[in-house]
Structure formats: C-alpha cells, structure tokens
C-alpha cells in the first residue's frame, strides 16, 4: 500500500477552489474564476439574478481544548471584502464538504 503524498498549501487552495466551482454548479450557480492569484474574491457566482463575490478558504480542523469536540477554524474577511460584500465559502479538506460562512454583521466579522 502506498502512502499519499502530502500536498503543499497552494495545491490545497487550488483543490478547494475547484471543489467550490463544482459545488456551486450543483447548487444552480454560474461560476467565473478570478484569473489572477490576488484580489478580494476567488470566484464570481450568479444565481437567480444575484451576483455573489466568493473567497474560498480551506477550513482547518481543530480540537476544542475544554470540550474535546472537533470543529473547523477559518479566517475572517478583510475590511475591503466586507465593504464589497464578499462571502466566505469554507472547504473542509477532510470530508470535502463546503458551506458558506454565516457572517455576524455586514460591517464586522
């Protein structure tokens, strides 16, 4: 039995974005990728006349020290992303699931 090769962080990010594209397609979105490696959003998604700017983030598995429960940790949006209405789409690399982050407020994360 061969060992799986460990992926570098940039390759994990590439995988997350491609899983995000297919997940969004499955959920009725038309998807357009950011052609550069920088910018406030990775994807632009259209559905039912609504445009959504999306930044895909790979969630990091964590173990809660007090409870022992597993949870995923992700980062916050930047001020520029908040002002532009960018939504974070989290990718769980363990089970390859995706979900939109429920942002606390439009002005603050």
Descriptions of predicted regions:
Residues 1-34:
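Acidic-basic catalytic patches of nuclease active cores, encompassing PD-(D/E)XK
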Residues 20, 24, 43-45, 49-60:
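Conserved catalytic cores of phosphodiester-cleaving nucleases, focusing on short active-site segments
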Residues 26, 30-40, 44-48:
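Active-site metal-binding core of divalent-cation-utilizing nuclease and nuclease-like domains
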Residues 33, 55, 90-92:
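Structural signal for conserved beta-strand scaffold positions within catalytic alpha/beta enzyme cores
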Residues 40-41, 50-51, 85-87:
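Short, surface-exposed beta-edge/turn micro-motifs
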Residues 60-75:
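Active-site-adjacent loop/helix micro-motif of nuclease/hydrolase catalytic cores
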Residues 71-85:
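Ligand-binding grooves and catalytic loops that recognize ribose/phosphate and carbohydrate rings
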Residues 82-109:
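Domain-level recognition of nuclease-like catalytic cores that cleave nucleotide substrates
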């Amino acid at each position: 039995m061969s060992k799986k090769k460990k992926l570098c962080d940039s390759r994990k990010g590439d995988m997350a974005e491609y899983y995000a594209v297919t997940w969004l397609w499955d959920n009725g979105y038309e998807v357009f990728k950011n052609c550069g490696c920088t910018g406030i959003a990775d994807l632009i998604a259209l559905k039912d006349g609504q445009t959504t700017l999306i930044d895909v983030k790979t969630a990091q598995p964590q173990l809660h020290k007090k409870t022992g429960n597993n949870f995923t940790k992700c980062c916050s949006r930047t001020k520029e992303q908040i002002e532009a209405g960018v939504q974070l789409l989290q990718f769980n690399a363990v089970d390859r699931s995706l979900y939109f982050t429920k942002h606390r407020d439009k002005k603050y994360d």
